Design a protein with these regions (language model features):
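A conserved beta-strand-loop-helix scaffold within acyl/acetyltransferase catalytic domains
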Residues: 1, 41-178, 191-192
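Aromatic (often tryptophan-rich) hydrophobic motifs at membrane interfaces
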Residues: 1, 9, 17, 23-28, ...
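A gly/proline- and charged-residue-enriched helix-loop-helix capping module
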Residues: 3-47
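Short intrinsically disordered coil segments
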Residues: 6, 75-84, 243-250
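A short, structural micro-pattern
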Residues: 8, 32, 54-58, 88, ...
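A general structural signal for short secondary-structure junctions and capping/turn motifs
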Residues: 28-31, 52-54, 86, 219
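Active-site/acyl-donor-binding loops of N-acyltransferases
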Residues: 43-71, 198-276
Length: 276
């Protein structure tokens, strides 16, 4: 038996305020399933619970959205301001996409990063089509695309919930990184958050030792925290885990650099559902 809540989320704290609320909630979950894994950023009760062990940690960054563009511009690191200005002067432009247009261009970048940089399969294209239909077309997010000349060289997919904007997906065209698209993209994300009345831009999870990405986020973020990965002590291996190595091997084969991109995409269509 598996209980999955908000799969692929960077973190998902239980909706409890203290240990007196956490204990009955967690006990019921443990009764239903012997395997329970959590990612907590705010809640301390699960972290202090002796029934769980900490199996990992990650960094979290956020940007408090200031009232004016000038205030926001002055707060970001000087190196970030220089990078944004340099990219703009070199001809990098950023456009906003609030419908299905441009989603395929972003997906092609995303597929290439997953495949050639990390050796991983990408989510199915229909996953991004669904995000577009359910978020972008309802003004609950935006796709930012960076262009140099006629080529799309970077993109960021942002999703909104209430007064928060989430930096959910980022992808870049590797040969285009010399034009520094990620800095104008980040600045455009901050501007979009301010213009749409958001109070926070959530930059999400970063692996603890991913120093390059940490430095990049710190140029813009004024908030930093820790995400704790927790797992029930002594939890037995679930039966579905037995297929894990096979799925992993298939993923590596289908995401190999010599495999046509169309085959890699189809591999994601077939296998990604098993990764939740």
């Amino acid at each position: 038996r598996r209980i999955v809540s908000m799969p692929f989320s960077d973190y998902c704290d239980p909706l409890v305020e203290d240990d007196s609320q956490w204990q009955p909630v967690s006990s019921e979950f443990l009764r239903l399933s012997p395997v329970l894994k959590l990612r907590c950023r705010r809640s301390t009760a699960p972290v202090d619970d002796e029934r769980f062990e900490k199996t990992g940690r990650a960094r979290w960054h956020g940007v408090t959205i200031l009232p004016t563009g000038e205030e926001a511009w002055q707060r970001v690191d000087g190196s970030a301001r220089r990078a944004v200005t340099k990219a703009q002067r070199a001809g990098v432009t950023v456009t906003r996409v609030c419908d299905g247009q441009g989603v395929r261009a972003f997906y092609d970048l995303h597929l290439a990063v997953r495949k050639y940089k990390y050796g991983l399969l990408a989510q199915p294209f229909r996953f991004f089509e669904s995000i577009s239909a359910n978020f972008l077309t309802r003004n609950q997010g935006v796709l930012l695309l960076a262009h140099f000349g006629e080529r799309t060289i970077g993109g960021v997919l942002l999703l909104r919930w209430k007064d928060r904007l989430y930096y959910k997906f980022n992808a870049s065209y590797a040969p285009g990184l010399e034009h520094r698209p990620n800095d104008p993209l980040m600045w455009s994300a901050i501007e979009y958050a301010r213009e749409t009345g958001c109070e926070l831009l959530d930059l999400g999870l970063t692996d603890w030792d991913q120093e390059g990405l940490i430095r990049y986020k710190r140029k813009y973020a004024d908030l930093e925290g820790e995400i704790s990965f927790l797992e029930r002590k002594g939890a037995p291996q679930a039966h579905h885990v037995a297929a894990g190595p096979l799925i992993g091997e298939l993923s590596q084969l289908l995401a190999g650099p010599t495999v046509p991109d169309s085959v890699t995409e189809e591999g994601g269509n077939l296998l990604y559902r098993y990764f939740a």
